[in-house]
Amino acid sequence: MILLFAVALVLPAFLWAAYVALRVATVGERDEPHPAHAVVVLGTREYSGWPSPPFGARLDHALSLYAEGLAPLVIVAGGDPEGDSYTEAAAGVRYLEHQGLPAEALLTVGGNNTYENLREVKALAEQESLESVLLVSERFHMLRSLVMAEDLEIQVYGSPTNTSPRDHNPALRFYYMLREVAAYTAYVLGLRNPTPV
């Protein structure tokens, strides 16, 4: 009886985790380089005003989408979750300007997690009459980001970077997959402020 009870508890959780992991993987492979009013880069760690390698990969991808003419603006999202003197958004803008992106093509929003970032993007889009966005992050992060954007009624297309070091290290890839399953589940359950990524 105890064994059956344990199976009844564990099996649904396992099936849910497997389902979410499959969706994370599937959506992360989907690239929709669709014309939009702005490219949105979701921030992640920065160090003393310069992006971490994963953040740099996101920014490089956004730069390539801008260079292809898919959007006239790049919005860099990210706050200051650790009390640094730079926000993630400011570090991203600094990097993109260093790569030659003109200042007039750059906008920033704050927020210390994905949902807050996208809520700020929604407000800016309404303010600037931006009807659609092309969202950039890493593969593992795309499902949750796109679902959140759609829940906020943002017209969104997804274009993940494929150059993040987290994608090319099997141990890191597995870790971030597990982390994303937990974060997506927390969001679905109504906990809208999962750990920033």
Task: Cite the ranges covered by each PLM segment.
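A structural signal for short, hydrophobic/glycine-enriched beta-strand patches
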Residues: 20-177
